[in-house]
C-alpha cells in the first residue's frame, strides 16, 4: 500500500525519481514495471503493472456508454520501467495533459499513485479545504 506525499522535480528529460521508500516495494511486487495514464481530475495515475491489469480489466468491462472514458484511461496508458536508479520517464503527452513541467507532487493512494503539478495540487487542495466535507464523512469519526 502506498501512502504519503512527496515533492519531486522532473529532470529535463521528463523523468521523475521514485521516492526510496516506494522503490523496494515496486521492484518486488511489480518488477519495476509501471503504467501511467490520465486521471479525470487533471493529474496522472501511476500503477504498479499488476494493479494496472486489475484496473484495466474493470475499465474494459464497462458498457458502451463509457466508451470515451475507456479511451481516456486505456488509450492514453503508457507502460514504463523504473530504471536501476529509481527513475521513471513520463511521456511529453502525459506531462502536457497534467500540466506538469518540473515541480510535482507524488501522492500514495493505496494501490496506485497520483502525480500532480505542484502548483495545481496546492491550489486544488486549498480550495477543497475551504469547503464543506462531503456527506459521506458525516458519520465518520476523526
Curated annotation (Swiss-Prot):
It comes from the Bacteria. One of its GO terms (cellular component) is cytoplasm. Coiled coil: none annotated. The keyword Isomerase does not apply. The keyword Iron does not apply. Keywords: Cytoplasm, DNA-binding, Repeat, Transcription, Transcription regulation. One of its GO terms (molecular function) is DNA-binding transcription factor activity. SUPFAM superfamilies: AbrB/MazE/MraZ-like (SSF89447). One of its GO terms (biological process) is negative regulation of DNA-templated transcription initiation. It is found in: Cytoplasm, Nucleoid. Gene3D superfamilies: Transcriptional regulator MraZ domain. Residues 5-51, 77-120 form the SpoVT-AbrB domain. Belongs to the MraZ family. Forms oligomers. This is Transcriptional regulator MraZ. The lineage of its organism: Bacteria, Pseudomonadati, Pseudomonadota, Betaproteobacteria, Burkholderiales.
